[in-house]
Each structure stands twice: as C-alpha cells, then as structure tokens.
Amino acid sequence: MSEPERPASKVTTPTTDTDHRPIRDRLAYAVAGAVATVAVEQGLDLVVDPSTVHLERPGRREHGDWSTNIAMVTAKQAGTNPRALATSLVEVLERSMPTHVVSVELAGPGFVNFRLDDGWLHEALAAVLAEGEDGYARPDVGHGERVQVEFISANPTGPIHVGNGWWGSYGDALARVLARTGHQVSREYYVNDTGGQIRTLGRSLLARAQGADMPDGGYQGEYVIDLAAEYDGPDDVTAAGRWAADRILDKIKATLASVGIIFDEWYSQASIEESGAVDETIALLEAQGLVYEQDGATWFRSEQLGDVRDRVLRKANGDATYLAGDLAYHRDKFLIRGFDRVIDVFGADHHGQVASLMAGVEALGVDPSRLEVKLGQMVSLVDGNETVKMGKRAGNAIDLDTVISDIGPDATRILSLMSSLDQASTFDLASVREQSAENPVFYVQMASARIGGVGRKAAELEVVRAPLAEIDLSLLTHPRELDVLRCLEELPEVVADAAVDRAPTKVTTWVRKLASNFHGFYHDCPILADDVDPHLAQARLWLVEASRIGLAIGLGLLGVSAPEAM
C-alpha cells in the first residue's frame, strides 16, 4: 500500500506550540488518557500509567509514524477483545487529536497507529538547533548513578592484541554513552602486575638477556628481545618481571591513547595484595563460614552460592589466586569506593569465572545485580580473501598497533563497533581501505566532510545563515529532508536505548543511517544553487547545521572524529 500524501506542516519557527515534551511522551499521555476515558465510559477496571505505554515507529512507513500495542497488552485485564478495545481507543482519540496528529487508525489484531503532519519533525529540528551539540540527546536515564566500567585489563606481559582493542572500543564507547545519559562514570584498567605471569615474564626476559633457553611457557614475542636489550637490572625474576611489565604497560597506554581510550584509573593488583586487602577479604568470607582449608590451600564455598564448584582463594604455595584478588578488588569497588554499579568487560575466556565472582560479591554483602559482566567474543581479521596472521612481534596474537597503523584509529574504532560484543565476528580490513559507500568509515566521514563543504561554499558565496527565529522550517517538506529530520528526531531515543541495553553499536547503526540520509539529501536537494528559493536555502542551511550536530554527537560517542574535509 502506498503512502498517502502527507499534510502540510502547521509549524514554523519559533513554534507556537507550548507543549515542548517529545512527541513520544505526548502520545503516551494521550493514549493513557484515552484508556481512562474508555474505562469510565464502558465500566472497565483499567488504569494505565503513561510511562508504561509502549510506542514504536512502524517498520513500514505506510503504517503511520507511531504505533502502540496498548490494547493488546491490556485487553485481558479489561476483560474485552483487543481489537474491540483498540476500536474504542481510536474513537476517543479522534475526538481530541493530540498536536500534529492528523489521523488515528486501527490496524491488525489491535494496533493503534498515528499519522502526523510534518510539524513534529520541524519541532525536533528546532530542538536540535536550540540545544546544540552539548545539550541535545542527553536523556537522563542514569539519574546520577555512579558507574565504574572496567575494561581491557590485559596482563602487561605483551603488546595489546586485537581482541582487547575491540572490547576496549566497546568499553570506552559504553562509558561515553553512560556519561551522556546521566551517569557518573569512571573508566578503569585493572593491572595484573603480580603473580605467576610476572615471574614468567621475568624468566623470559632474563633468558633473552643471558642467551639462555626460554623457560617452559615463556613469552616468545620479539618484544621480549627488545626489552632484554634494554635491561640492566638484577638477575632477580620478580624484579625483572616488574621492570618489563612497567615498560609494556607504558606501551599499552600509548596504543590505547592512539585510538582515544583514556582511563581514569589504572588499578594495580600488586597494590591490593601489598595493602592486605586480600587477607581482609578472605577473613570476611571466613567469618561467614564460607572458607575452609584443604590440601594446604584455602578454599571458598562458592558452590553453595550458585557456582558449579568451590574455588581456591590461596594456593598451597601461599600465592593468592586471581579470584581472591578479584574479590578484594570488587570489595574495594563497591564497599570502599562506593560505586552503585560496576560493569566488567572481559574476554570470553573469563566465562568460567563469572559465577564465582558473582558468588563472592554476594557473600560480601553486595546485591549481585549491581555487577554486570559483559563477555567479548572472539575477533578474527581477514584482508580480502586472506586471513590476517599473527605477528612475530606479539608472539601469539594479532597486534593492535599493526592494525591501527594499517587502517587508522577512526577505522579501527568504527570497525570494532560494527557488531555486538557477544557475537564472534570476522572483520575485513580491505573493506575500510576503499573510498566507496561499502566502506562504513569513509561513508560516514564523507557525510561530515560534505557538511563542512557546504559551510565553505556558503562562505565563498558570502551567504550567511539568518537567525533561526527568522527561518520558516516548514519549507522542509522534500522526502529526503524529512528522512534526515526523522533520523535526527530518533537520536535521544537511540542514545537512551544504547545506555539501557549496554549496546553502543546502536549508535553505530544510527550514525550510518544519518550519513546515508544526509547523502541522499545532499544529492537531491540543492542548497546554494542559483535557482533555489532563498528562504528554502536558509532552511536547508539550518538542516545541514543540525546534521552536523547530530553526526558530531554520534561520532563523539563512538570515539571517532568528524572531519570537515577529506
């Protein structure tokens, strides 16, 4: 079914509508009010809170601009048929149409669909321009919640690999989204700078420095040879390991900074053990009868708290296990530093540790629902038809630095945020080298460059944007213009959903959609051509500015630059 001709907009700028709530909120209140009216008129026991009214944009434009399933989810409570209830709701809504609604229609088994004039989109445009890059799309879903996001936390025993980089992009983008949505966010990297892996690193370093055979399980990468050439310290395994770990960590920091990942805190595992926090944490568990000794080791009764088996906290040789350190660390997060919520981003190889960590957190008196663990799945890279092989420098992994040097930091960020964290993914490096619409990085950044080009062309022609209050935004009626407006109107909802669902990839999808819509507008709607009405040209210039704002917000959340030229 083809879409009927859309009615002309009733709204210019500034708007005369005094209700500045988002259209979604207005429709929700209208629907809740209609439910109340139907309940009174028909004697139904039915009350609906506006916040529970589900509204969505239909997948097909011919079904209208907004749709609600309220009749289907409340019909049973009301003791009536969903379609009959929807029919009554349509009749009530038609008596007093909400602003911008031109028709309300019954569809399918009980959907209520709304068709709107274009004025709601012009209102959204005015909101983008009034609030700007700093103010638009800042839905307060966090209400000041203090959230710590721990991510990457790779052992400082070798160069950071692609998997860590990909999961790092997720953690950083999630932190950016949370910060924009009313959360107080702290980004943290947990440095595993003690224990067996540091001693193994020390033995590997000393073996290379002395020309001896590598120890079993030693680190084989060329970076160890480079470090050995610099080392002039004592022949002490722990001292050598700590020295090498410090140098490697400096390199990790530089690598991550090159893709815009900056941490608020680098938290040392060694500092936890040296402070006595591990012993204190074990003592707290012991006081609850959750610790026992067996075979010379100290065990945690985690099975009785939902784990598949009990876990060792301290080995027979006296070394604390990763779990013991993690529990002391999370005790510090929740009970010492007082975070309301902690989000840990781990690699999938940590899957077996989640239940024991949750059990330990609960045993320490923390509601385990306050701890969220996100597991990043395996990442594979191809280059055209060729699998990207592990490099000699990293030893047993694909080096993130190599990828950044090849495709650049922006491409690395966007590529790593193209698919969900919990899906094993294969990425083609060749796809982000092409200057074509198939290259998501080029396609998105070209939209930004075209926006910059419009500004340069306007300056060249000495065309200045008139004050917004003088602009008639209702002139923007071309389908391509409306596509851009719809996309901009969606951004606050997209950002909110990305925060609630912990899914920054939703922003990636939106950015690509805006870029596509802007390219269509740029191609079909001349802005500064001689035959364009000056009033329309001014409205289009403001639409370009709104697109710049939206793209800057979206790319900023992804940690990607918005170039003014390419």
Q: Could you say what each language-model-derived stretch is?
A:
Residues 2-122, 129-566:
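Non-catalytic interaction-recognition regions
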